[in-house]
Amino acid sequence: MVKHNGVLYRAAAAHAHIYPGKIAEKATENVGRFYDLPMAEVGLPHVLNEEGTAVGFDKFLVCSVATKVEQVGSINRFIAAKCEKYPKFVGLGAWHRDIEDVEKELNEIQALGLHGIKLHSDFQGFAIDDEKMLPVYKACMARDLPILFHMGDARSELSAPKKLANVLEKLPELKCIAAHLGGYQRWDEAKACLKGANVWVDTSSSLFVLNPDEARRSIEHFGMDKVMFGTDFPMWTHKKELERFFALGYGEEENRKMLYDNFEKLFKL
């Protein structure tokens, strides 16, 4: 548990990336280079577990991105193995636009005990509202599997908030997490076009840019029951992101929702 102003909170970090040891350092460096940001840690599973546990975290939502379709199976087996090794980990499956048998792949993801899928359209080279992805979204919706979408980047339209809004116009029951408070560098656009009963957001890679008033406007737009704390590990440490989160000045009830309760409810833990 984490402690703030004498109050103890259960805490889940709802956005973390992990990589196998042989590629972790290179993968971490590549992400830092893409965003032109220094990385606080290396994306190794044991580093996440140790660093987050030392701060008091109870759960970590872990994922990795497949940039090639042939990587999907091995990534998902890796994520599942690390979730078995580290009981605090809750895993999401990797996905790729070029997967041919959607139902078979989702069966395998669920058989591995994974709780949804992660998409990063900027890294994977497709728009969120690509027609080829609609059968995937429909299949996830039918299985009640959440999808974590990387959202936003001023340099790309592939992950623009409007792209997810286009999908939700067709599939309003799709359970989705719009990462980075709805859209990194595109927070105003996210507030303009994203909201709904099945839209969650996380706070990852947002609080280092937004001042507390700006962050609160985004949080209150989406609703206190739909916001989850996230770090974007290995980009930021849990300690630093917690400091930024508590600087928003919310009360005990709101903190409990965003730090753990919303995460627990979404993933049915």
Specify the residue positions occupied by each region the protein language model found.
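Active-site gating/metal-coordination segments in enzymes
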Residues: D58-K59, T67-L148, D153, V209
